């Protein structure tokens, strides 16, 4: 079923059909950091990274996952954004950058909240493992689960310029492995990165389509 008013399937309408009501993502900061930015790695991080720019005011790493969810629901409700379904969106940082016991505890706390119907895990394609996918697959039997990979570009040259720390082949492997578990997979791409031409931006279209993603974000 396609949205009759848009030349593409928009995220909101698609999720409404799938989950049976208006869906609101609630950003969560699990304070897991990033393997590409921490002091031990000495890699410096991506040149474009500024986590504070997209972290909502209600995300407070001093608060528990449950407290952040409560604050997020209050935040959206006060702005007339109440929803029928809520998804805990582990957005800030790399949300698979921990041992599986820690991840299980964090994800389980979110899913134990009575208002939460599923989780979306934002992470890097070079920070996923079969053990983590096992965990997410187990959750997916009872809840909506999606993984959102920061791919940013299909060009290895551009990825090196922005010090991304992985190549495009790594992203393809991560997406393929995740989809094999019947878990929804999304990806972020940044258009207009340094040294990227308009022709290169447009040429990515077929490559991105070949990933068969369930959803995609362009920045």
What are these regions (language model features)?
Residues 100-108, 129-138, 199-201:
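Distinct, well-ordered alpha-helical segments
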């Amino acid at each position: 079923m396609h949205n009759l008013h848009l030349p593409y399937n928009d995220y909101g309408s698609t999720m409404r059909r799938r989950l049976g009501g208006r869906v609101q993502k609630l950003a969560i900061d699990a304070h897991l950091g990033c393997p590409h930015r921490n002091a031990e790695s000495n890699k410096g991080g991506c040149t474009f990274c500024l986590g504070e720019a997209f972290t909502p005011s209600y995300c407070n790493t001093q608060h528990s996952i449950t407290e952040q969810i409560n604050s997020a629901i209050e935040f959206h409700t006060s702005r007339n954004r109440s929803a029928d379904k809520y998804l805990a969106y582990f957005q800030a940082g790399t949300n698979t950058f921990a041992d599986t016991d820690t991840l299980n505890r964090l994800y389980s706390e979110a899913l134990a909240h009575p208002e939460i119907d599923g989780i979306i895990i934002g992470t890097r394609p070079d920070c996923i493992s079969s053990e983590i996918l096992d965990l997410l697959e187990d959750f997916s039997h009872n809840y909506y689960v999606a993984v959102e990979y920061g791919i940013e570009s299909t060009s290895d040259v551009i990825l090196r310029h922005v010090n991304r720390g992985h190549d495009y082949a790594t992203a393809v492997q991560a997406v393929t492995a995740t989809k094999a578990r019947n878990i929804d997979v999304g990806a972020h791409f940044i258009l207009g990165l340094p040294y990227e031409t308009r022709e290169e931006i447009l040429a990515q279209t077929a490559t991105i389509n070949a990933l068969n993603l369930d959803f995609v974000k362009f920045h």
